[in-house]
Amino acid sequence: MHLANEPHVNNMIDGKYEYFSFISYRWEDEKMAKWLQEKLEHYKLPTSLCEQNPDLPTHIRPIFRDKTDLNGHTLEESLMSALESSRYLIVTCSPRATQSEWVNRGIQKFIDLGREKDIIPFIIDGEANADDPKNECFPPALRSLKGERAIYGININDNGRDAAAVKVV
C-alpha cells in the first residue's frame, strides 16, 4: 500500500471508500485471513509518518472480511458492493485460492474497475507463476496480468508472516 506515496489515500478518508481494504481468501485459508485482518487493523502507523503526512489515518481500518462484515443482502451483492467500497484488495494467495471462483471474481472485479494496481497478493502457500500447476498460488485473474500490468506478491515465506504483514502497509 505504501501510504506515504499514495496521493489518493485522502479520497478514502474523505469518504470515497468505506473500507481501507477487502481481504479475499479461500475458506480453507480463513485462519490466516482472520490473522491478517486483526494484524492490519491493530497496526499503528509510525508517529513520524503521520506527523509528516497529517491527512494519513493512524490506523489501517476498517478492513472487510466476509465473516466479520457481511450484511443482509445476497452474498454476491454484498461482496461486490464491499469490493467497490474498498480502497485495496488483499488476496490471500495459495494453491487453494486458485480453485475459488469467488476469489477470482473479486480480482476480476478490481481489474474491470481499472484498479489492478490496488491489488495486493499476500502469498501464504505455493508460488506465483509456478512451473508446477499444483504449486501455483495466483488465481487465473492475477495470472492474466502480464508485462507492465503484472503484480508481484508479498510472500510470508521470505521474512515470516509478521514482516510480510508490515510490507502490506
Which residues fall in each region the model found?
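An anion/phosphate-binding loop that grips the pyrophosphate of nucleotide cofactors and donors
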Residues: S86
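Glycine-rich, N-terminal phosphate-binding loop of Rossmann-like dinucleotide-binding domains
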Residues: C93
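Hydrophobic acceptor-binding patch used for acceptor engagement in glycosyltransferases
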Residues: L89-I90
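Flexible domain-boundary/linker segments
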Residues: C50-N53, R96, G106, E127
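Short mixed-charge
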Residues: H42-P62, N129
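C-terminal interaction surface of TIR/SEFIR-family domains
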Residues: M1-K39, T68-E77, S81-A82, T98-E101, ...
